[in-house]
């Protein structure tokens, strides 16, 4: 549990804060009283905590990262939230560059733009954006819970913030992130 929290802090600038405080024993940690041996194999509870962590960390950091100047961003220094997949080749190239950066930054995986994992991640992003655009009644602002900057909901007219949140959640659930 401590290693996961340190990794999140190193990558996102602050700890998630849930594993060490509320879920330490469930995530295989010890308390030096009733539990003195760490779990060596992943459990179902650990998998559930990993899903919660990926969703929550992504929720807290994607919109906030886009609110910064590009030079200060950890996650998205090479793309803006209004860059939409399929709109033109330049847009797709920017998105692919951002995905390559995320793979390297979060997974320590150095892949080219034409790597199958990069393409899979691009398709995930493009599908989320396209599906949201097709559906009627989806708010053009980011969610209440995830999409606030200074207490105000952020506009997300192209659904790209939600798409990027999906991508970060997906990457945080990869074994390369969880079990390095």
Predicted regions and their residues:
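Composition-driven recognition of low-complexity segments enriched
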Residues: 1-180
């Amino acid at each position: 549990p401590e290693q996961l929290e340190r990794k999140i802090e190193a990558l996102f600038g602050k700890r998630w804060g849930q594993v060490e405080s509320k879920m330490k024993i469930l995530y295989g940690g010890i308390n030096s009283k009733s539990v003195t041996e760490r779990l060596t194999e992943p459990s179902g509870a650990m998998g559930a905590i990993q899903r919660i962590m990926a969703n929550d960390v992504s929720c807290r950091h994607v919109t906030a990262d886009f609110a910064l100047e590009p030079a200060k961003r950890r996650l998205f220094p090479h793309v803006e939230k209004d860059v939409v997949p399929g709109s033109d080749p330049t847009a797709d190239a920017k998105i692919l560059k951002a995905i390559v950066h995320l793979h390297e930054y979060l997974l320590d995986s150095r892949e080219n733009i034409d790597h199958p994992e990069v393409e899979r991640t691009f398709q995930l992003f493009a599908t989320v954006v396209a599906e949201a655009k097709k559906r009627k009644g989806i708010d053009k602002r980011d969610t209440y819970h995830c999409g606030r900057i200074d207490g105000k909901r952020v506009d997300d007219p192209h659904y790209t913030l939600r798409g990027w949140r999906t991508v970060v959640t997906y990457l945080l659930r990869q074994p390369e992130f969880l079990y390095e």
